[in-house]
Amino acid sequence: MFSLPGYEYFLGFLIIAAAVPILALVTNLIVSPKGRTGERKLTYESGMEPIGGAWIQFNIRYYMFALVFVIFDVETVFLYPWAVAFNRLGLLAFIEALIFITILVIALAYAWRKGALEWS
């Protein structure tokens, strides 16, 4: 078998990291009560009895705002590494990032014009 000097601590950490959740799950199975009766069958909703059904329909406006948020959040995830390495990448990477930002600005203008960002 091959030897990896210096990785003993890492291997120990991996063993502990795997053992702790397994130990917690096994302890839960052993210690927890088995039957579900009375209060345990009720749905918990902020300490009160639940009112209404669980399948309510949200207004589509929430989905539109969430979609726009996710788009610009992903844009940030893509642009952050580019901004960190900006000095080393050169002009071509700058032009590519500019095209990427332009496409997203056009998409934002389109959503704005279609009224996707208006609440009323």
From Swiss-Prot:
Gene Ontology terms for molecular function: NADH dehydrogenase (ubiquinone) activity; quinone binding
Entry's EC annotation: 7.1.1.-
Domain of life: Bacteria
First-listed, main subcellular location of the protein, grouped into a coarse class: membrane
Topology of the protein relative to the lipid bilayer: Multi-pass membrane protein
Transmembrane segments: 10-30, 64-84, 89-109
Compartment(s) where it occurs, according to its Swiss-Prot or TrEMBL record: Cellular thylakoid membrane
Enzyme class: translocase
Pfam families: Oxidored_q4 (PF00507)
InterPro entries: NAD(P)H_OxRDtase_bac/plastid (IPR023043), NADH_UbQ/plastoQ_OxRdtase_su3 (IPR000440), NDAH_ubi_oxred_su3_sf (IPR038430)
Reactions catalysed: a plastoquinone + NADH + (n+1) H(+)(in) = a plastoquinol + NAD(+) + n H(+)(out); a plastoquinone + NADPH + (n+1) H(+)(in) = a plastoquinol + NADP(+) + n H(+)(out)
One annotated GO biological process: photosynthesis, light reaction
Gene3D superfamilies: NADH:ubiquinone/plastoquinone oxidoreductase, chain 3
Keywords, comma-separated and alphabetical: Membrane, NAD, NADP, Plastoquinone, Quinone, Thylakoid, Translocase, Transmembrane, Transmembrane helix, Transport
One Gene Ontology CC term in the entry: NADH dehydrogenase complex
Self-association state and partner proteins as the record states: NDH-1 can be composed of about 15 different subunits; different subcomplexes with different compositions have been identified which probably have different functions.
Function: NDH-1 shuttles electrons from an unknown electron donor, via FMN and iron-sulfur (Fe-S) centers, to quinones in the respiratory and/or the photosynthetic chain. The immediate electron acceptor for the enzyme in this species is believed to be plastoquinone. Couples the redox reaction to proton translocation, and thus conserves the redox energy in a proton gradient. Cyanobacterial NDH-1 also plays a role in inorganic carbon-concentration.
Family per similarity comment: Belongs to the complex I subunit 3 family.
Protein name, UniProt field: NAD(P)H-quinone oxidoreductase subunit 3
